[in-house]
Amino acid sequence: MGAFVGIFFINIFQDRMSGQKLLLLAILIVAVAGGLFSLLHAFASINMKADQTISGTALNLFAPAFAIFTARMIQGVQQIQFTDTFHIDKVPVLGDIPVIGDMFFQNCYITTYIGIGIFLVAAYVIKNTRFGLRLRACGEHPGAADSVGVNVAKIRYAGVIISGVLAGIGGLIFVIPTSTNFNASVAGYGFLAIAVLIFGQWRSNKILMAGFFFGIMKTLASAYSAIPFLKSLPIPNELYKMIPYIATLIVLAFSSKNSQAPRAEGIPYDKGSR
């Protein structure tokens, strides 16, 4: 949903503005859209105490269908095209640093730095703030949190909305450097994000490493033709594109048993049961 709203916004306004200003504005728009869309999930799972897996799956099926329907209704085709004016050839000063400049500050997108910033802020908030402590408590033992005066429903609503905001931003960040022709799909990478969370064992530092690992897998799937050794191998193109998904299955097979999710994750809270 975030990818659709963001790319559609860029498609409409790219003739009036361009570059980083348009991209940053699009990110704000998708953050709001993602937060609003997540309210449907929050209401179903918190107020109605619906099964969160079913609610999430329903919304996940609805989002691409809504994107395709809306795109075809407005412009007659499923694909939404946009002009990539967001690529940064070199960050001033930082791009001139030997080795590091070539790796991190040349041929890049501002979304990379936004993603790193979001990770750092999220890691700090979860570990070092009152809200983070309450959020973890409502995921581990909501009854105990409720007994000391924490509004479990309010905190869980906040958690779901924040997740929606980040998911919306993530959808746009995925599409921008990948293609200039969005076809209402993010190729299942939202589910790979869940795999990153499980592989990272719900810990910030491990999630960072897991994200880096899956980033390498995605790079191999997308840019294998630029690597002479991989290009020379008699392997079909389709197999390279399967690398992130195959890696996900292998990683989850070996790590899912050791990954401890919050004990109350996915369980509706009934105040009368504590």
Region spans (language model):
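Alpha-helical transmembrane segments within multi-pass membrane transporters and channels
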Residues: 17-64, 213, 218
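Transmembrane helix-bundle core of multi-pass membrane transporters
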Residues: 63-128, 229-237, 259, 264-274
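Hydrophobic core segments of alpha-helical transmembrane domains in multi-pass membrane transport
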Residues: 3-9, 31, 64-68, 112-125, ...
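Cytosolic-side transmembrane-helix boundaries in multi-pass membrane proteins
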Residues: 140-154, 224-274
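Short, non-helical or kinked segments that cap or interrupt transmembrane helices
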Residues: 1-5, 46-59, 134, 158, ...
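Helix-loop-helix "hairpin" substructures at the membrane interface of multi-pass membrane proteins
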Residues: 104-181, 204-205, 209
